[in-house]
Amino acid sequence: LGDVYKRQKLYEPEEENPMLGFRGASRYVSDNFRDCFELECRALKKARDEMGLTNIQIMIPFVRTVSEAKRVIELLAQNGLKRGENGLKIIMMCELPTNALLAEQFLEHFDGFSIGSNDLTQLTLGLDRDSGIVSHLFDERDPAVKALLSMAIHACRKAGKYVGICGQGPSDHPDLAKWLMEQGIETVSLNPDSVLETW
């Protein structure tokens, strides 16, 4: 049990604010997480190459910088998961303001965006959506958030790449879902109980 706990502490360090800490692409490119990342890559490669599940795509979350994007793509290729090979597509979660602001540069390394509107809104407005004090300010329809959403969508459309959105916003606000469609979004995730109203 002690050894298991040590490994857990290595891969899941305690942080004051894990939401902004060791997660996403930063974890994948870290030497401390390398064994786990390689194991995940082997599992994906086996599913695609040996089991014939070539419909499996890869999605990379929380990519902070363009250099981090480049590095994670390189590591995937080194582990036998090369973008474009055997139809492999690698999508990036667009959930940081920097992702929308530098969308064209990030898209050089990926086959499209899945926009994570929850994190994008939280980080754009600088608030904790789980806070009982400021969570009432959380709104994906805020003009600043919509400006970033528009930038990300238009960059994908311009590049001829996929763009979809996941997050609570379209389920809570049918007007936002309509606006997203007008902007050119390809897919929208919805809660089951909101499909008819949003449709």
Annotate each language-model stretch with its function.
Residues 2-199:
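Conserved alpha/beta-domain cores
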